UniProtKB/Swiss-Prot annotation:
Name of this chain's protein: Prestin
Carbohydrate-modified residues: 163, 166
Protein task: Electrogenic antiporter that exchanges sulfate or oxalate for chloride ion in a strictly coupled manner with a 1:1 stoichiometry. Adopts a dynamic conformation, which alternates between the exposure of the central binding site to the extra- and intracellular solutions leading to an inward-to-outward conformational transition during the transport cycle.
Organism: Gallus gallus
Binding site for salicylate: 404
Length: 742
C-alpha cells in the first residue's frame, strides 16, 4: 500500500504532460490526414465469402458447434477426473429429488421430471461451452410451464363427463388430464428449443441483454412467491385446483385458506419436519463449507427418509397422505410433440426460451469469469435449443440452468462437462432400475424441497434497499418486474417488465444530465463547474455537455437545457431587441411630432424677433423657447433608418458557445436539424457555436444527413474542447481589435 502511495507521489512530482501543437479543427485535421482506401464489398461478394469453405474454416465451425471435440482430446485425466466424478455424484444426488419436485411445479407426473433431468443434461455435455453450470429442471421455468399447462388443460374441462365417484373413473380422469398436460409441456419444450436454435444460428445471443439484472431478480423473486404459493396445498395436504394467469397467486391463496380446516395433519407434520431438516443441513453446509469435502446431500437424505417412513407407516392408507405414485420403469419410447398446440403457446414458448437462456448464460458468465475461460453466448443458445427440442421427443419439459446445483457442481471440484454427464447417468440408473422405490414418497416432502430451495430467491427482497441507495431507476425496474409478474402472471409480467425497462432507456436519453464545463487552471482538462470549486469558466465562453446522443426523443429537451444552462436564449434576446427597437422607433416618431408642432407654433407667432429667437433656440437646443416640451436627446431626434439599423441592445456577454460531443454516440435527422437550427439562432445574436470532440462515426452521420453547408462548415468542429476554447479566444480578440481600429 505504501509503495503504491509513493509511486503515486513520484508520478505527480516528476512526470509532466507537455504538448505544443497547432489548434485543430476538423477542416485542418482532415487536410493533414490521409484516409485508408477501403473498397466496400458488394452483397454478392459477402455471400460468396460466407459460403466459401476451407478445411480450416470447416474445422473451426465443427469445433464451434461441438465444443466437446476440442476439449475432450485434451482432457487431463489425472488432474480432472476425480473432481468431476465427485462433482457428478453430488450433483446427481440433487438432480433426483429436484427433478421429482419440479415436475409438480410443471403440472406433470414426477417421472417426467426425471426424464428432464437426464436427456437434456446428457446432450449439454456435447454442445455446451460452460464447464460448471448444471442443466436440468429449474423452479422458475417449471412454474412457467405449469402455468401454461393448467391454462390449456384446466381441471374444469377434463372434469366434464367424470362426475362419478368410482375410483376407476377418478383414475381415468387424472390419467387423461396428466396426459394432456404432458403434451402441452413437451410441445413447449420443442417450440422453445426451436426458438433458441433459430436465435443461436442467427447470432441473436444479445437478446439476453434486454433482461437486465434488476428485471431478472425482480421477476425471479415474484416467481418464487408463485412457486411457494403453489406448494402450500401439498404441504398442508388440501385439495384445491391450480390457477394460472392474472391474480393466480391471490386465487391460490384464497383457495388454500378456504380449505385450511381440511388440512392433513400427517402431511403437515412430515412437510414441516423435512423443511427443518433441510434448513439445518443447508446451514451446516454453509458454516462448515471449508471443512466438508462435499456438501451433505440433505435433499436425497430427506427423500430416502420420507420414502421409508411413508412405506413403513403406510401413510397413504392410514392418513390419506398424497404420494408420488406410479413411476414407470425404463425409458419411454420417443414421441412427436403435438404440433397443433403451437399457435396457442407460441408467446409462452418465446418467454420461456429467453428466460431460460438468460438464466443459463448469466450463471455461465459468472463461473467463466471466476475460472478464467470464455463462453459463447450464441453457442449456449444452440446448446439449450438442442437440449429442449431433442429432449421434447423423449417427454422432457423445458429446462435451463439451476443455480443451486451449479454451485454444488462447481464447489465440489467439477472441472468440465463430464460432471454433468455423470449426474445424468445417475438419474438414468434411477429411471431404469430403482425408480419404483420412490413411489411411496409423500408429495409434501417434494413441496418441502421446493420451498427450501426458494430461500436464495427470497433473499432478493434485500435488492430493494440496495437499489434504493444506488439507482432509483433500477429500483423501479425491479419493483415493476416483481409486481407485474406477481399479479399478472409470469408471462405477462415478463413482457410488462421488458417494456418498462425499454421505456426507462428512452427516459434516460430524454432526461440526461446537462453540465456547463470549465477549465482546471493551467490544464486542458474541463470539468463540471457546479461540482468543483477550482474549475473556472472563460469569460464570454460557455461549454455545454449532455451525456446522451442527440435524436428525435431528446432534441427538444436538449435545446431547452442549452438555453437554461448557458443563460442565453436567442429567441428571447431577439424578441427583446425587436421590442426595444419598436419602442425606440415610437420615441423618435413622438419626438418628431413634438418638433413639428413646436416649429408650426413658432412660425405663427406675430413677432419676427421672437420667431428668429425661437428658430435659433430650436436649431441649437432642440426645444421650444417656452420650455413646455420635454427635452429630446439629440440621438433620439434623428430618426434616420441607419441609426435604427445599428440599434442592437440588449446584448449578451457570451460571444462563444462550445458543444461537447464526446458523449454523443449517434445523431439522427431530427437531431441534425435541431443542431443546425441552434447554430443559426445563436449566430443571429452574435454568439459563435462550435462543436468539440465529435467522433468519426458521428461526423460521418452528419455528413450523410447534409448537415454541412456554406453557413455550417467543418471549421466549426474541433478536435478537443481546448482547441475550441483557444480558437474562440483568438477569434474574440481579433473581433475586438477590428472594432477598436474602426
Amino acid at each position: 500500500m505504501e509503495d503504491a502511495q509513493e509511486s503515486g507521489e513520484c508520478l505527480v512530482q516528476n512526470q509532466k504532460y507537455c504538448v505544443e501543437r497547432p489548434i485543430y479543427n476538423q477542416e485542418i485535421l482532415q487536410g493533414q490526414l490521409h484516409k485508408r482506401e477501403r473498397t466496400p464489398q458488394s452483397l454478392r461478394q459477402k455471400i460468396e465469402h460466407s459460403c466459401r469453405c476451407s478445411s480450416k474454416k470447416a474445422k473451426s465451425h465443427l469445433y464451434s458447434f461441438l465444443p466437446i471435440l476440442k476439449w475432450l482430446p485434451r482432457y487431463p485425466v489425472k488432474e480432472y477426473l476425480l473432481g468431476d466424478i465427485i462433482s457428478g455424484i453430488s450433483t446427481g444426488v440433487m438432480q433426483l429429488p429436484q427433478g421429482l419436485a419440479y415436475a409438480l411445479l410443471a403440472a406433470v407426473p414426477p417421472v417426467f421430471g426425471l426424464y428432464s433431468s437426464f436427456y437434456p443434461v446428457f446432450l449439454y455435455t456435447f454442445f455446451g461451452t460452460s464447464k460448471h453450470i448444471s442443466i436440468g429442471t429449474f423452479a422458475v421455468i417449471s412454474m412457467m410451464v405449469g402455468g401454461v399447462a393448467v391454462r390449456q388443460v384446466p381441471d374444469e374441462v377434463i372434469s366434464v363427463g367424470y362426475n362419478s365417484t368410482n375410483a376407476t373413473d377418478a383414475s381415468d380422469y387424472y390419467s387423461l388430464r396428466d396426459d394432456k398436460r404432458v403434451q402441452v409441456a413437451v410441445t413447449l419444450a420443442f417450440l422453445s428449443g426451436i426458438i433458441q436454435l433459430c436465435l443461436g444460428f442467427l447470432r441473436f445471443g444479445f437478446v439476453a441483454i434486454y433482461l437486465t439484472e434488476p428485471l431478472v431478480r425482480g421477476f425471479t423473486t415474484a416467481a418464487a412467491v408463485h412457486v411457494f404459493t403453489s406448494q402450500l396445498k401439498y404441504l398442508l395436504g388440501v385439495k384445491t385446483s391450480r390457477y394460472s394467469g392474472p391474480l393466480s397467486v391471490v386465487y391460490s391463496l384464497v383457495a388454500v385458506f378456504s380449505k385450511i380446516t381440511t388440512t392433513n395433519i400427517a402431511a403437515l407434520i412430515v412437510g414441516l419436519t423435512c423443511i427443518a431438516l433441510l434448513l439445518i443441513g443447508k446451514e451446516i453446509n454453509l458454516r462448515f463449507k471449508k471443512k466438508l469435502p462435499v456438501p451433505i446431500p440433505m435433499e436425497i437424505i430427506v427423500v430416502i427418509i420420507g420414502t421409508g417412513v411413508s412405506a413403513g407407516m403406510n401413510l397413504t392408507e392410514s392418513y390419506g397422505v398424497d404420494v408420488v405414485g406410479k413411476i414407470p420403469q425404463g425409458l419411454s419410447a420417443p414421441a412427436v410433440p403435438e404440433i397443433q398446440l403451437i399457435p396457442a403457446i407460441f408467446i409462452d414458448a418465446v418467454a420461456i426460451a429467453i428466460v431460460g437462456f438468460s438464466m443459463a448464460v448469466s450463471m455461465a458468465k459468472i463461473f467463466a469469469l471466476k475460472h478464467g475461460y470464455t463462453i459463447d453466448g450464441n453457442q449456449e443458445l444452440i446448446a439449450l435449443g438442442i437440449c429442449n427440442s431433442v429432449g421434447s421427443f423423449f417427454q422432457s419439459f423445458p429446462i435451463t440452468c439451476s443455480m443451486s446445483r451449479s454451485l454444488v457442481q462447481e464447489s465440489t471440484g467439477g472441472k468440465t462437462q463430464i460432471a454433468g454427464a455423470l449426474s445424468s447417468i445417475m438419474v438414468l440408473l434411477v429411471i431404469v432400475a430403482i425408480g419404483y422405490l420412490f413411489e411411496p414418497l409423500p408429495q409434501t416432502v417434494l413441496a418441502a424441497i421446493v420451498m427450501v430451495n426458494l430461500k436464495g430467491m427470497f433473499k432478493q427482497f434485500a435488492d430493494v434497499a440496495h437499489f434504493w441507495r444506488t439507482s432509483k431507476i433500477e429500483l423501479a425496474i425491479w419493483v415493476v418486474a416483481f409486481v407485474a409478474s406477481l399479479f399478472l402472471g409470469l408471462d405477462y409480467g415478463l413482457l410488462t417488465a421488458v417494456a418498462f425497462a425499454m421505456i426507462t432507456v428512452i427516459y434516460r436519453t430524454q432526461r440526461p444530465q446537462y453540465r456547463i464545463l470549465g477549465q482546471i487552471p493551467d490544464t486542458d482538462i474541463y470539468c463540471d463547474v457546479e461540482e468543483y470549486e477550482e474549475v473556472k469558466e472563460y469569460p464570454g465562453i460557455k461549454i455545454f455537455q449532455a451525456n446522451t446522443s442527440l435524436y428525435f426523443a431528446n432534441s427538444e429537451s436538449y435545446t431547452s437545457a442549452l438555453k437554461k444552462k448557458t443563460g442565453v436564449d436567442p429567441c428571447a434576446i431577439l424578441a427583446a431587441r425587436r421590442k426595444a427597437q419598436k419602442k425606440h422607433a415610437r420615441e423618435i416618431k413622438k419626438a418628431n411630432k413634438v418638433k413639428k408642432k413646436a416649429v408650426l407654433k413658432l412660425v405663427n407667432s406675430s413677432t419676427n424677433d421672437v420667431e428668429a429667437s425661437v428658430k435659433h433656440e430650436i436649431a441649437n437646443d432642440g426645444l421650444p423657447a417656452n420650455g413646455k416640451f420635454a427635452f429630446v436627446d439629440a440621438g433620439v431626434q434623428d430618426g434616420s433608418p441607419d441609426e435604427l439599423e445599428h440599434f442592437v441592445e440588449p446584448k449578451t456577454n457570451v460571444h462563444s458557445l462550445i458543444l461537447d460531443f464526446a458523449p454523443v454516440n449517434f445523431v439522427d435527422s431530427v437531431g441534425a436539424k435541431t443542431l443546425k437550427s441552434v447554430i443559426k439562432e445563436y449566430n443571429e445574436v452574435g454568439v459563435c457555436v462550435c462543436i468539440a470532440s465529435c467522433s468519426g462515426p458521428v461526423m460521418n452521420e452528419l455528413t450523410r444527413l447534409n448537415f454541412f453547408d456554406n453557413t455550417v462548415t467543418r471549421e466549426l468542429l474541433f478536435h478537443s474542447i481546448h482547441d475550441a476554447v483557444l480558437a474562440c479566444q483568438g477569434k474574440d480578440r481579433s473581433a475586438s481589435q477590428t472594432a477598436l481600429d474602426h
